[in-house]
UniProtKB/Swiss-Prot annotation:
InterPro entries noted in UniProt: Methyltransf_12, SAM-dependent_MTases_sf
UniProt name for this protein: Uncharacterized methyltransferase C1347.09
Organism: Schizosaccharomyces pombe (strain 972 / ATCC 24843)
Keyword Signal: no
Superkingdom of this protein's organism: Eukaryota
Compartments reported by the entry: Cytoplasm; Nucleus
The entry's keywords: Cytoplasm, Methyltransferase, Nucleus, Transferase
UniProt family annotation: Belongs to the methyltransferase superfamily.
Function field: Probable methyltransferase.
């Protein structure tokens, strides 16, 4: 296990997994999922901090919410999806109505446990939605995997900035696609605020943050091109104004005169502005 993978496993432990789903991550996952589903052709969304505070009961498991113009790519029958670095399943929950099967993989057992518990509580069988503690190195196509290793779509949301060798990972994700399948990557845009920008290098290593400043769109497009993915393009951007706790605020590059919000339990939250993008490419 590499140092960066070990750091990610250590950071996303049971405590972190239990509190990972919060109003900010829920709202961000919703807007990223909408970009993935709609292919909004470079349009930009402003995700304001006064969005409704989505809770577990509000998460999409039907396709008739406020999403319109879902791309025809998602209307094919029998779709299979891999959610790489799936975490607690926030993206999977939004994409589930549009597929026959969704598989999540993550290096954190605690994150995977939360993912699977969610879907079991909704009486969705594991044959249709299930996460596994696996890394990309475990998916070698030798038949030992508990699922098919060919997918119509592979998604990776807010994980690339935790990955050291991005080209290697992009190449491997590309190989898991069926012909005409799509890879979707969502992450931070370089130059916007980030939760990791003010960390000392030792702290960055502890958190498993390999590219803490985010990415330029062109840098991700180049990764896709080198992985032989065609028609790579930015399919959506968003500015997300979200509330974070003091620890994340102190790690952020947000100016130190941010808006604050006092909670009833005495905790203070701070507003941080993130710039997000979603990029997609096709395996030909």
């Amino acid at each position: 296990m590499s140092d960066i993978v070990y750091a990610n496993v250590s950071h996303y432990n049971k405590i972190e997994a239990s509190k990972y789903d919060n109003p900010s991550t829920l709202a961000i996952s919703k807007v990223i999922s909408s970009k993935i589903l709609q292919f909004e052709d470079n349009s930009e969304t402003s995700l304001r901090h006064d969005l409704p505070k989505y809770d577990q009961d509000r998460l999409l498991l039907t396709s008739d919410d406020d999403l319109t113009n879902v791309n025809n790519f998602w209307k094919k029958s029998g779709m299979s999806i891999l959610d790489f670095a799936c975490g607690t399943g926030l993206i999977s929950q939004h994409l589930f109505p549009y597929c026959k099967q969704i598989v999540g993989i993550d290096v954190s057992q605690d994150m995977v446990d939360v993912y699977n518990e969610k879907f079991r509580k909704m009486n969705i069988p594991k044959e249709r939605a299930c996460a596994y503690v696996l890394s990309l190195d475990d998916l070698d196509g030798n038949g030992d995997e508990p699922f098919s290793t060919e997918f119509d779509a592979v998604v990776c949301s807010m994980a690339y900035h935790h990955i050291k060798d991005l080209q290697e990972v992009t190449n491997k994700l590309s190989k898991l696609l069926k012909p005409n399948g799509r890879l979707f990557v969502a992450d931070l845009i370089k130059g916007g605020d980030t939760f990791h920008g003010n960390l000392h290098p030792d702290e960055i290593a502890k958190l498993g943050v390999a590219h803490h400043g985010g990415f330029t769109p062109q840098s991700i497009l180049n990764l896709f091109k080198n992985a032989s993915l065609s028609n790579a393009e930015v399919i959506g951007k968003a500015q997300a104004n979200v509330w974070v706790d003091e620890a994340k605020y102190q790690r952020s590059t947000q100016s130190k005169d941010a808006k604050t919000l006092d909670l009833a339990n005495g905790e203070k939250l701070y507003e941080v502005k993130l710039q997000l993008m979603v990029i997609s490419g096709i395996k030909t």
